[in-house]
């Protein structure tokens, strides 16, 4: 459920750390715009890549399959699929389970807890410890950015059962379009993928390089806008207890910060 107002007590002014991040991001964006797409394409050809259409990058059983998305991507997917914003995306949060804890269900979307009843209390404690500095005095958990929703077995919500094809392929996020490559610190990096070290054409490498640069700059600009809009919040010792009480009742209240502002949701 999405709530229009955060209701969270806020501080005024930007923090020193926030100002440093803004300056650093502005500098990186300026440098990113000067990157040579032809040189990047040549690097991609040296590495080599050909998609194997295995769908493993969409399945949690084969590794971290979270897909970070920015607001314009959410809107494109929402318009294409007819789903609501919160059916497409959820708050970006750390994972608190291991692949052997997957429950195998495919039809419904993910829930925040991967814990059984026996160790529920320890799970809540572990979960909230990850957010200790991001819980406000009212027990709201503040997160930064969004990820694509996943099923209860933690596979991507758009991965078709059986065919392992993407139901939102024409509007898939840039992370998916450029996987297993990404740019960080102005340098090309790769994720683990069976398609690496396979031949790639000049044309395909150029298209991939263009998409990588577009993704890199778009994500940096989105992050910059988020930190420029960000307003710090009040914290106290009661916040952690309030958050735990909510979890014990089966709900979790997030305040998601992104480039458009803040969104309060209850899951």
Model features per residue range: what roles?
Residues 1-267:
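Short loop/turn segments that flank or connect secondary-structure elements
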